[in-house]
Swiss-Prot record:
The modification Phosphothreonine is found at T501. Belongs to the protein kinase superfamily. Ser/Thr protein kinase family. I-kappa-B kinase subfamily. It comes from Homo sapiens (Human). Induction: Induced by lipopolysaccharide (LPS) and TNFA. This is Inhibitor of nuclear factor kappa-B kinase subunit epsilon. InterPro entries: IKK (IPR051180), Kinase-like_dom_sf (IPR011009), Prot_kinase_dom (IPR000719), Protein_kinase_ATP_BS (IPR017441), TBK1_CCD1 (IPR041309), TBK1_ULD (IPR041087). Serine/threonine kinase that plays an essential role in regulating inflammatory responses to viral infection, through the activation of the type I IFN, NF-kappa-B and STAT signaling. Also involved in TNFA and inflammatory cytokines, like Interleukin-1, signaling. Following activation of viral RNA sensors, such as RIG-I-like receptors, associates with DDX3X and phosphorylates interferon regulatory factors (IRFs), IRF3 and IRF7, as well as DDX3X. It is found in: Cytoplasm; Nucleus; Nucleus, PML body. One of its GO terms (molecular function) is protein serine/threonine kinase activity.
Length: 716
């Protein structure tokens, strides 16, 4: 045990160790509160006095939630070594998070954004206080879990930090070589003499490498054999990097340098976030200081990302989930353009559903009016795009092979790589199942909308047909129309014949809609059956079971690698563990390929066929709806003409009757008196009936107009 006046710790509770100090987990003697103590060794006292006290002075100036707090500076009892008492971060460092096999291909998007927010806030506080850190790397970013379960990242280890204004330079070299600015790397690692001075932007390069590492799980610049074994090529990669490139690698010995301008496909970040992040990385991983961004622009651009909101959009036709990053104050038009950029679906062709309901977005309205979405509850984009599906790299391509002999360190590294690929397979399997669920749900919603359209259009058609049938079936009209001597009645008979034709068209439309309803119901039953099969899928559980067993063996390898060697029996167990581990990995990848990928690809093909049927059905319903509307419009016109004709005929008969009553002696009537009287009565009743029918047809037309206001998709 060691102690100071107020704190004590056991030397076994080592948290980290460097060239000049060791960090231990300690406790407050009075309260029992856990803290971290940094105990400086004898080597640290060989440094100049100014350098020794610099870390204390820097930490005393800082007070921010994203920087590890300094509680006290004390001394050990016997040797009187200086001790920094600091905030204890119980969840390790960002490096330990990235070293976990679950994060072998980088952090999930939400966690990466937390890292970005914390690092930017912490660096901004340093800059406000005129301090350059000079050793930014994942190992110097500590993690703490907050009360609500969220991660909080804090900058630590200010042993290399010093006060420096924007226009000042320094010449001393600090830092960890993989994260060093190329100019500092040349001097510190390659030991090449140079007269260059360094400014505050050296931290930007280190931040760029750190962010790339957090996003992908690997370093951006990798020479053949690794950065520590091939230092000259490492320097070449960083200094010869073309503008816009964010990574470089040498795949084989003496091979060419290959450049990357995008993040790898294995990265967990969405394309929406990648499109915002890549330009930042390209401009801070810039060796020429004249071209490299300054802190002001870096803070402005990263703050722009962090201030954006995410709208989750599932392109139903493409079967792809998109993350659209926009500002809350942006208009819907800007949102639609962002969707267009990722999906290639033009704004005028974008239709949205949310939780089963049509979601009409007005371009001029603020994006704040968009419903809150999540990855499992996104806006569903309906368009005529061709299915693409989730793009991914087969995890089997990233599975390393065990060496035949027993090599504890090599076996551990291999197991770690295989386990990382296994976790990637698990993530992809979940994404494939989630994608199928979103396909089924979106298709079900679209078919529900089409069924509702069928019901409304059918109601309009049947109502119009009922009115027409009622009018055409009246005996009074038949008796009146049977009087051929009156020319107007011949015209009325022709109009009546046209109404009969329209009634036949409406009848066919009604039958057509009924058949469409049956077709949609059949497709929906098929969809429910497919959805149930996906819900019964147990591939995720099988993969997880393999991973749990592999994890147990991996932990055994992790313990063994620290030992100098194994006894005979232990070595035999180790060999069996390697065999079992390989079998489990093979089984895991087999389940992924046969139960996940193949079923997903088959589902994608079926989805494409169903989408074509849905688009054809929708276009067909539009045509039927137009036919019903046209019939209603024409029937309304015919009814109005018929009503006007009968009204004129009724008026003429009234005039003839009045003239006949005044004449003496009464002339011989062209028609028998009873017929004239009945005819007049029938005309008046028919006029009223025609007016009512025309009014009903007008109401139907208004209903159809409202139906047609729903935006229509482009023609297939």
């Amino acid at each position: 045990m060691q102690s100071t006046a107020n704190y004590l710790w056991h030397t076994d509770d080592l948290l980290g160790q460097g060239a000049t100090a060791s960090v231990y987990k300690a406790r407050n003697k009075k309260s029992g509160e856990l803290v971290a103590v940094k105990v400086f060794n004898t080597t640290s006292y060989l440094r100049p006095r100014e350098v020794q006290v610099r870390e204390f002075e820097v930490l005393r100036k800082l007070n921010h939630q994203n920087i590890v707090k300094l509680f006290a500076v004390e001394e050990t009892g016997g040797s009187r070594q200086k001790v920094l008492v600091m905030e204890y971060c119980s969840s390790g460092s960002l490096l330990s998070v990235l070293e976990s096999p679950e994060n072998a291909f980088g952090l999930p998007e939400d966690e990466f954004l937390v890292v970005l927010r914390c690092v930017v806030a912490g660096m901004n506080h340093l800059r406000e206080n005129g301090i350059v850190h000079r050793d930014i790397k994942p190992g110097n970013i500590m993690r703490l879990v907050g009360e609500e379960g969220q991660s909080i990242y804090k900058l630590t280890d200010f042993g290399a930090a010093r006060e420096l204004d924007d226009d000042e330079k320094f010449v001393s070299v600090y830092g960890t070589e993989e994260y060093l600015h190329p100019d500092m790397y040349e001097r510190a690692v390659l030991r090449k003499p140079q007269q260059k001075a360094f400014g505050v932007t050296v931290d930007l390069w280190s931040i760029g490498v750190t962010l790339y590492h957090a996003a992908t799980g690997s370093l951006p610049f990798i020479p053949f054999g690794g950065p520590r074994r091939n230092k000259e090529i490492m320097y070449r990669i960083t200094t010869e990097k073309p503008a816009g490139a964010i990574a470089g690698a040498q795949r084989r010995e003496n091979g060419p340098l290959e450049w990357s301008y995008t993040l790898p496909i294995t990265c967990q970040l969405s394309l929406g976030l990648q499109s915002q992040l890549v330009p930042i990385l390209a401009n801070i991983l810039e060796v020429e200081q004249a071209k490299c961004w300054g802190f002001d622009q870096f803070f402005a651009e990263t703050s722009d990302i962090l201030q954006r909101v995410v709208v989750h959009v599932f392109s139903l036709s493409q079967a792809v989930l998109h993350h659209i990053y926009i500002h809350a104050h942006n208009t819907i038009a800007i949102f639609q353009e962002a969707v267009h950029k990722q999906t290639s679906v033009a704004p005028r062709h974008q239709e949205y559903l949310f939780e089963g309901h049509l979601c009409v977005l007005e371009p001029s309205v603020s994006a704040q009016h968009i419903a809150h979405t999540t990855a499992s509850s996104p806006l569903t984009l309906f368009s005529t795009a061709i299915p693409k599906g989730l793009a991914f790299r087969d995890p089997a391509l990233d599975v390393p092979k065990f060496v035949p002999k027993v090599d504890l360190q090599a076996d551990y590294n291999t197991a770690k790589g295989v386990l990382g690929a296994g976790y990637q397979a698990l993530r992809l399997a979940r994404a494939l199942l989630d994608g199928q669920e979103l396909m089924f749900r979106g298709l079900h919603w679209v078919m529900e909308v089409l069924q509702a359209t069928c019901r409304r259009t059918l109601e309009v058609a049947r109502t119009s047909l009922l009115y027409l049938s009622s009018s055409l079936g009246t005996e009074r009209f038949s008796s009146v129309a049977g009087t051929p001597e009156i020319q107007e009645l011949k015209a009325a008979a022709e109009l009546r014949s046209r109404l009969r034709t329209l009634a036949e068209v409406l009848s066919r439309c009604s039958q057509n809609i009924t058949e469409t309803q049956e077709s949609l119901s059949s497709l929906n039953r098929e969809l429910v059956k497919s959805r149930d099969q996906v819900h019964e899928d147990r591939s995720i559980q099988q993969i997880q079971c393999c991973l749990d067993k592999m994890n147990f063996i991996y932990k055994q390898f992790k313990k063994s690698r620290m030992r100098p060697g194994l006894g005979y029996n232990e070595e035999q167990i180790h060999k069996l563990d390697k065999v079992n581990f390989s079998h489990l990995a093979k089984r895991l990848l087999q389940v992924f390929q046969e139960e996940c990928v193949q079923k997903y690809q088959a589902s994608l093909v079926t989805h494409g066929k169903r989408m074509r049927v849905v688009h054809e059905t929708r276009n067909h319903l539009r045509l039927v709806g137009c036919s019903v509307a046209a019939c209603n419009t024409e029937a309304q016109g015919v009814q109005e003409s018929l009503s006007k004709l009968l009204e004129e005929l009724s008026h003429q008969l009234l005039q003839d009757r009045a003239k006949g009553a005044q004449a003496s002696p009464p002339p011989i009537a062209p028609y028998p008196s009873p017929t004239r009287k009945d005819l007049l009565l029938h005309m008046q009743e028919l006029c009223e009936g025609m007016k009512l029918l025309a009014s009903d047809l007008l109401d139907n037309n208004r209903i159809i107009e409202r139906l047609n206001r729903v935006p229509a998709p482009p023609d297939v």
